[in-house]
């Protein structure tokens, strides 16, 4: 009987710990204090890396949004890491004021694409490195605001990603899941002094060697 009771309590504890974990961070994510950073004293050199694996349908729009920044063009470089893009897509990209790095791998991955780009660009390519997915869209003030954050002494940032489309039940569910994850695993973590969980896109770091 005692052995059964201990097993029961261990089972309850195993179920309770994840619930308490989620509840704790969800509770601390509720206060919505808005971080406001002062204007940056220095404009840093930035590079935006966009790994694009067979992303012909979305990469042009993403690249255009990444370029359309309220930030000095000479300090803001956009690099598309093209993995198996169509020739016509590559042609359209090369018409834009950005760098195209073509890569080919037996087994493609974002990590391999980013490593190849960093090796090609070198460690002194920029002071701020931004990683976007091929379908991430950013607004025109994005680079300015990220520079303000780094000017405050922060060396790594996970930006807030939101769903683009909410025109179907599945899209709404995906958007809700994104916001729940952002609240619990990012806002909640930061509120308790922990690092934000990473989502491998919209990440900003202070130099390429940190990749």
Predicted regions and their residues:
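N-terminal membrane-anchoring/stem segments of glycan-assembly enzymes
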Residues: 1-42, 93
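Catalytic cores of nucleotide-enabled group-transfer and carboxylate-activating enzymes in metabolic
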Residues: 31-32, 69-71, 139
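Cell-envelope/extracellular polymer assembly enzymes that use nucleotide-activated donors
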Residues: 45-47, 77
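Acidic helix N-cap motif at the loop->helix transition within catalytic regions
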Residues: 60, 86-94, 141
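Short, acidic, metal-binding catalytic loop of nucleotide-sugar glycosyltransferases
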Residues: 64-75
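A conserved acidic beta->alpha catalytic loop
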Residues: 79-90, 104-107, 137
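Long helical/loop segments within the catalytic core of UDP-sugar-dependent glycosyltransferases
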Residues: 102-123, 140, 145-206, 210
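Short beta-strand-to-loop acidic/aromatic patch adjacent to the donor-nucleotide binding site
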Residues: 125-137
